[in-house]
Regions:
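Short, acidic/small-residue loops that bind anionic groups at enzyme active sites
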Residues: 141-162, 178-186
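N-terminal phosphate-binding or glycine-rich loops at protein starts, especially the Walker A/P-loop
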Residues: 2-64
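Short, charged beta->alpha transition segments
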Residues: 103-114, 139-143
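Internal, active-site/partner-interface "lid" segment
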Residues: 32, 174-206
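Short Gly/Thr/Asp-enriched flexible loops that form oxyanion-binding sites at enzyme active sites
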Residues: 125-148, 166-169
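Short glycine-rich or small-residue beta-strand-to-loop segments that form or flank ligand, phosphate
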Residues: 120-128, 154-157, 171
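Glycine-rich phosphate/diphosphate-binding loops that line cofactor/substrate pockets in enzymes
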Residues: 36, 108-121
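N-terminal glycine-rich anion-binding loop in soluble enzyme alpha/beta folds
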Residues: 41-106
Length: 206
């Protein structure tokens, strides 16, 4: 590697570190304001592709989606149990990865816990266009409403996956911090989700 190429690589890495640090600081500020307000419990899932430090700083619950590799099922837990490096190295080596939806039972467990706490809850769910999980979430939410008629729980199809869903979720935290109620947040999200778009490229069709 030439000195100029090495210098450019170092600069790019430093810029990425600075950007991540700035995002974490902003997320921490939003998280403090969101929790201080305390009137909405926002839940998201791992298909929003949160940077782990941002999710921790915001303090929102992230439901992990399952994926399966040759050694069995794993939880997409924001790289806690398997690093991003190890995951993609296995894929580059030819590992076949499949995914599956979150079960109604898992959603029921999460929503029952939220009902016990009593704070109105909004789940920004991975879009129905790519997964049946939102149907499972709505089924679980209906069961919780039956058991707890006074508890407010809403399931919103976020329409957009990956980083676009992350942006929507971060802005939702901001809206709660600014004072929106759960019902108002749902109305906001059902409109705002159409203003966020994601673009993807593929290395191959394998």
């Amino acid at each position: 590697m030439s000195s100029s190429t090495e210098s450019a690589a170092v600069t790019a890495a430093e810029n990425e570190v600075d950007t991540n640090a700035q995002a974490s600081r902003e997320a921490a500020r939003l998280g403090r304001a969101y929790h201080a307000r305390g009137n909405v419990n926002l839940i998201v899932d791992s298909c929003a592709d949160f940077a782990p430090e941002v999710a921790r700083a915001l303090g929102v619950e992230v439901i992990p989606f399952p994926y399966v590799m040759s050694d069995g099922e794993h939880a997409d837990d924001l790289w806690e149990t398997m690093s991003a490096h190890d995951f993609y190295e296995r894929m580059r080596a030819g590992e076949h990865v499949t995914t599956s939806a979150v079960t109604p039972g898992h959603y029921l467990e999460v929503f029952e816990r939220a009902a016990a706490e009593g704070t109105p809850t909004v789940y920004l769910a991975f879009t129905r266009g790519l997964s049946s999980s939102v149907d499972a979430a709505r089924q679980a939410a209906d069961m919780v409403r039956e058991a707890h008629p006074d508890f407010q729980i809403y399931v919103v199809d976020n329409v957009c996956p990956s980083a676009a869903a992350e942006l929507l979720a971060i802005e939702a935290v901001r809206q709660v911090a600014n004072g929106l109620t759960a019902a108002e947040l749902v109305a906001w999200a059902e409109e705002a989700r159409y203003y966020v778009h994601g673009y993807f490229t593929l290395d191959s069709f394998d």
